[in-house]
Every structure is written in C-alpha cells, then in structure tokens.
C-alpha cells in the first residue's frame, strides 16, 4: 500500500531513477567478451588449479591452448615437400611458442601440425592467432585449425552472432502475444523494453564483476575470467520466461480493473496492491534458488548463478515493481490504446471475461 502511494505521487521520478540505474549498470555489456572458463579459474589449492599451474610452469601458458593445424593440399597437390616452409610460416606468426609435433599423411596430400601459443586459451592473442592461421596464404596449401581451443573460440563466436537473432525473435513473438492478450500497443512495448533493460543490466553487471574483475572475490570467484560463452543465450531464455510471468501477474490485474472501471490510475494501483506481493514473493524464491548456484565449486555454475540471481533482482524489483507501474501511471489511458483496424485483425483472446461482463450488463 505504501509503495503504491509513493509511486502514485512521483511516477516520473521512479521511472527516471529506475531507467537511469539499469542503463548505467548495462554499460559494461558493450565490451563483453565470451569464452569458456578453464581450470585456471578454480580456487588455489584445488586439484584442478594445482594441475593447471604445474603444467603452465613446465610447458608455458600455451600448453592449455594447443592448436591442431591441418595442412591440406589443393588441386591434387602434395604437402610433404612444403612441410619445412609451413613450419617456418607458422613459427613466424606472433604468439606461436613452439611446434610440438608434425604428422604427415603417407599419401602426401595432408599433414597435421600441432603447436602451442604463448598465451592461454581465452587470451585475445590466441583468438587472433587462430584467425591468422586460417587466413594465411601458402601456395598450393589450405590451412585449417581445430582442437579444443579452436572449437571453443568458434562456438563463442557463433553464439555471439546468434544472440541478436535469438533475442529479437523471442522478444518479437512476446510483443505480438501480449498485444493480442492485452489489446494494447504500449503495454507490450513497455513489457519487452523493460526486459531489454533488465537483460542489459544483468549482462553488464556480470561483465563488470567477472570479466573486469570488480569484487569477484565477494561472490566466491578465484579470479577474473571471460563471460561464459553460452551464458547470454541461457540468461535470455530463463530470465525472459520469469520476466513475462511477473509482467502478466501485474498487468492482467491492471487490465481487469481498467476493463471494469475505465480508470487507468486506479487500475495501476489495484495491480500493485493485489499482485505486487505475488511478484515480490516469486522474485525472492527465485533469488534464493539461483543464489544457491553460487555456492558450487565449479566456476561455470557460479557464473550462471550470479547472472540469474541479479537478473531476477533487476527485473522483479526494479523493472516490474518500479518502472512498469510508474510508466503505466504516466501513460494513463493511452497505455490501453489499440487502433481499431488492428483490433479487428488480431484474434480476440478474452482472458479477463470482458465479453461475459458486457453480456451480463446488457441483460440487467
């Protein structure tokens, strides 16, 4: 009740503060780098970290970033006579430490060259080296790069490329569904833009902590690392479902009240009073669940827990309980505007029973 009154008095202030806060937290997202955490991200004293450090001490950081270069002859040529040239070309590249093995095929049209970079698997120098080898031009020979490190780099890049398409697809579908259900243009637009804000803040916060190395010890991480390559996709999927649930909890009650009274401000107040507690309780439950992930020893599980915990905090408590009602108050009746031509085209899903109420009123 008190929160609803405060929002009703200063909706512009609450909307502005919420949007500004999430926008600022989102800034690190724009330099987010994806990768796959390795054993160097475990805490010191663990078996994984001790083994990693011993191998680095003996063979260098690049031991954990070994690359498998496949030299393939073009147009029925052969590679054997060019092995020395190939090795010289590879060793001349920046950040190549040493070649560990060369295995030519007996027929001569192919050879496998294994090499170690000077840097680790998540270093930008290693990523650049993979691209440099693939783009190298040696007459009559085509170079391919594979191995665990190269595959992780490729997966990270593929996921980065797929992220905008995935996000636009599910956000676009949600906009259409919400438009059909709530018979409005601005309500679904506000819902999906609110999700974009909370998603940006979530990934920005994770980047600031995990990648930029701010307060990572507080959350139980041993060191900074790149952001888990499949985390954005995973976060979008899970957080989007939760965010839209919270949105439906709030807005369906607002829609019901508006359909009955026609008073937009009263509808928002009813939604906050009667559904706000549900959103708060649901958010706290999910925060408790996801925070438990951060107790795990595995760095990847910790990162997932961090992202989802703060994702729910940002969406449930800042977007849904602060920005959404404040913006709804500011929009007034315009929030429920739907062009007549569009209203006729869209299927009518009467989730609030408005048609039944109208029929009953006619009979009276």
Predicted regions located by residue number:
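Structured non-transmembrane domains adjacent to transmembrane bundles in polytopic membrane proteins
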Residues: 31-216, 226, 248
């Amino acid at each position: 009740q008190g929160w609803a009154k405060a929002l009703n008095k200063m909706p512009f202030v609450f909307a502005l503060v919420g949007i500004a806060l999430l926008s600022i937290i989102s800034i690190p997202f724009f330099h987010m780098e994806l990768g796959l955490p390795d054993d160097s991200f475990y805490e010191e004293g663990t078996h994984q970290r001790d083994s990693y450090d011993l191998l680095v001490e003996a063979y260098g950081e690049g031991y954990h970033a070994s690359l498998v270069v496949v030299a393939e002859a073009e147009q029925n040529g052969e590679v054997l006579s060019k092995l020395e040239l190939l090795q010289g070309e590879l060793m001349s590249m920046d950040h190549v430490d040493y070649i560990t093995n060369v295995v030519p095929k007996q027929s001569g049209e192919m050879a496998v060259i294994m090499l170690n970079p000077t840097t680790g698997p998540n270093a930008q120098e290693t990523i650049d080296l993979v691209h440099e080898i693939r783009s190298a031009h040696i007459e009559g020979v085509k170079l391919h790069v594979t191995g665990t490190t190269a595959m992780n780099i490729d997966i990270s890049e593929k996921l980065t490329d797929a992220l905008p398409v995935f996000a636009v697809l599910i956000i676009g579908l949600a906009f259409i569904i919400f438009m059909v259900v709530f018979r409005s243009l601005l309500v679904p637009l506000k819902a999906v833009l609110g999700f974009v804000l909370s998603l940006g803040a979530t990934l920005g916060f994770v980047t600031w902590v995990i990648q930029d190395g701010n307060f990572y010890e507080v959350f139980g991480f041993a060191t900074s690392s790149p952001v888990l390559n499949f985390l954005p996709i995973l976060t979008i999927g899970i957080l989007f479902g939760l965010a839209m649930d919270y949105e439906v909890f709030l807005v369906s009650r607002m829609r019901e009240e508006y359909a009955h009274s026609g008073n937009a401000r009263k509808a928002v107040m009813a939604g906050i009073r009667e559904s706000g507690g549900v959103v708060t309780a649901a958010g706290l439950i999910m925060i408790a669940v996801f925070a438990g992930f951060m107790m795990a020893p595995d760095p990847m599980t910790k990162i997932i827990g961090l992202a989802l915990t703060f994702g729910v905090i940002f969406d449930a408590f800042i977007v849904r309980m602060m920005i959404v009602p404040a913006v709804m108050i500011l929009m007034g009746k315009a929030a429920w505007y739907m062009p007549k031509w569009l209203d006729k085209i869209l299927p009518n899903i009467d989730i609030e029973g408005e048609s039944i109420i109208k029929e009953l009123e006619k009979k009276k």
